[in-house]
């Protein structure tokens, strides 16, 4: 496997961060964990589990979860590498809030995975390839395009309708009726 990297004079490696157009210096440990995520991506394809995506979650410089895309293996369109790693890390650490952890992804996360990263409160994301690399080999970006308002939501015949009347009222009451019983964090 040939690595693509840009090395600075101080030995750091530059990769894209989660913010478009922003470059961040990545130190040796970051490179090590990002390399592990890339290895997971290869592993997932080699064993037929799913697409070429890998993710590693780290706590105090120790790997908590190292996963790859499992969409085909589990017949689950949500079993992306990042989501699978978050699920595994939450189970291992016995909590749903991963604010002391970092995630390394082989590719820029899709909107669903960004959502999972946000909801799990991961403190840092380092990714290698831009989404365009995945798009170039046939993975689509229609959800991101739809969210940005730059594309037409053609790939789905999904009808979206907000309920009204009694259906909406009873659904909204769930939150009022359970606010004292349920605390997320």
UniProtKB/Swiss-Prot annotation:
Catalytic activity: guanosine + H2O + H(+) = xanthosine + NH4(+)
Primary location recorded for the protein, binned into one broad class: cytoplasm
Cited CDD domains: nucleoside_deaminase
UniProt GO molecular function: guanosine deaminase activity; zinc ion binding
Binding site for Zn(2+): 80, 110, 113
A single Gene Ontology CC term: cytoplasm
Tissues/organs with expression: Expressed in roots, leaves, flowers and siliques.
Gene Ontology biological process: purine nucleoside catabolic process
Phenotype on disruption: No visible phenotyper under normal growth conditions.
Domain CMP/dCMP-type deaminase: 28-142
Pfam family name, one: dCMP_cyt_deam_1
Keyword terms: Cytoplasm, Hydrolase, Metal-binding, Nucleus, Zinc
UniProt-annotated location(s): Cytoplasm; Nucleus
PROSITE patterns for this protein: CYT_DCMP_DEAMINASES_1, CYT_DCMP_DEAMINASES_2
EC nos: 3.5.4.15
InterPro entries per UniProt: APOBEC/CMP_deaminase_Zn-bd, CMP_dCMP_dom, Cytidine_deaminase-like
Disulfide bonds: none
Active site, UniProt feature: 82 (proton donor)
Family affiliation: Belongs to the cytidine and deoxycytidylate deaminase family.
Described function: Catalyzes the hydrolytic deamination of guanosine, producing xanthosine and ammonia. Deaminates exclusively guanosine and 2'-deoxyguanosine but no other aminated purines, pyrimidines, or pterines. Deamination of guanosine by GSDA is the only source of xanthosine production in Arabidopsis.
Name recorded for this polypeptide: Guanosine deaminase
Species of origin: Arabidopsis thaliana
Gene that produces this protein: GSDA
